[in-house]
């Protein structure tokens, strides 16, 4: 059987049978993408979603192979950028001009970034989950970046309760009838009896999605979130780094509501962040459940 005579049931058209479909395509296509780093461009594994609408004329299906081959051709040979994703969506529509008015491409990967230690001269690699995407509706393209930042959150309520216990311990160990000896008190504070309680803290996650321009770098969004929260988890840690981390946690006590408001304030101050939605999950060490909060700019992005 020749190629010309191979059947293609996707081309069947029966208006009474085939209703329009919002999105159809492929999810989690396995592709390597070219990611720019400070010292060069490297191939990293990624998962790609490639979709178009099926809404121009009644048809049983789209051209799946066209989406796959275009994704493979364009995304594996050029440096990954939002502008490149916009080009991909334009090609999706060009090859489906008789079928589709909208196209979407989404690339999910782990971004390796070098982070400096808090105090020492060390640095460490961190891996950040990132999703970059482009949405094209009849030539109008929107760009999005989504990141997940891991941070530490120390409970303000637990901190207050711990301070009260420390005060009680001080009262029990030092009489008001005698003058306090600075050296004795200073030494006592350095013992387990001096700091008898500590507040509960936990690893926490900020998931942030932003609408941005075509030239935006996902690393900038990660930096904004980490700077707002101040307690991003660390890689290489010496004692001076761990002490600084303890200080930052003590100076940045956070409920999940506090984390949300901090990041909202930081994002609202950035003109190149057009819209955003974010959720915060504190994986509680006190409870078997998480404490969660959700914010948005209040425009189009209201959920992920």
Curated annotation (Swiss-Prot):
Keywords: Hydrolase. One of its GO terms (biological process) is tetrahydrofolate biosynthetic process. GO terms for molecular function: GTP cyclohydrolase I activity. InterPro entries: GTP_cyclohydrolase_FolE2, GTP_cyclohydrolase_FolE2/MptA. PANTHER family: GTP CYCLOHYDROLASE MPTA (PTHR36445:SF1). Belongs to the GTP cyclohydrolase IV family. This is GTP cyclohydrolase FolE2. It comes from Bdellovibrio bacteriovorus (strain ATCC 15356 / DSM 50701 / NCIMB 9529 / HD100). The gene is folE2.
């Amino acid at each position: 059987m020749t190629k010309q005579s191979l059947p293609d049931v996707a081309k069947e058209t029966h208006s009474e049978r085939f209703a329009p479909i919002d999105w159809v395509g492929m999810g989690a296509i396995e592709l390597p993408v070219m990611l720019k780093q400070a010292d060069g461009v490297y191939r990293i594994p990624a998962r790609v979603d490639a979709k178009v609408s099926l809404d121009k004329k009644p048809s049983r299906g789209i051209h799946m192979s066209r989406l796959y081959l275009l994704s493979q051709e364009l995304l594996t040979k050029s440096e990954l950028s939002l502008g490149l994703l916009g080009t991909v969506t334009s090609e999706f529509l060009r090859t489906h001009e008789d079928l589709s008015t909208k196209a979407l491409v989404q690339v999910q990967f782990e971004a390796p970034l070098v982070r400096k230690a808090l105090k020492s001269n060390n640095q460490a690699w961190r891996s950040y989950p990132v999703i970059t995407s482009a949405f094209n509706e009849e030539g109008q393209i929107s760009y999005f970046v989504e990141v997940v930042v891991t941070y530490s959150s120390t409970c303000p309520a637990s901190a207050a309760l711990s301070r009260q216990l420390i005060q009680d311990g001080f009262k029990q160990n030092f009489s008001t009838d005698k003058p306090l000896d600075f050296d004795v008190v200073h030494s006592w504070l350095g013992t387990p009896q001096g700091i008898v309680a500590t507040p509960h803290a936990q690893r926490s996650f900020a998931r942030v999605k932003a609408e941005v321009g075509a030239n935006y770098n996902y690393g900038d969004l990660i930096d904004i979130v980490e700077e707002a929260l101040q307690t991003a988890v660390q890689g290489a840690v010496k004692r001076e780094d761990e002490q600084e981390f303890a200080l930052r946690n003590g100076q940045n006590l956070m409920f999940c509501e506090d984390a949300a408001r901090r990041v909202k304030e930081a994002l609202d101050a950035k003109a190149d962040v057009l819209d955003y939605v974010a959720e915060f999950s504190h994986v509680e060490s006190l409870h078997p459940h998480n404490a969660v909060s959700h914010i948005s700019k209040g425009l189009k992005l209201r959920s992920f």
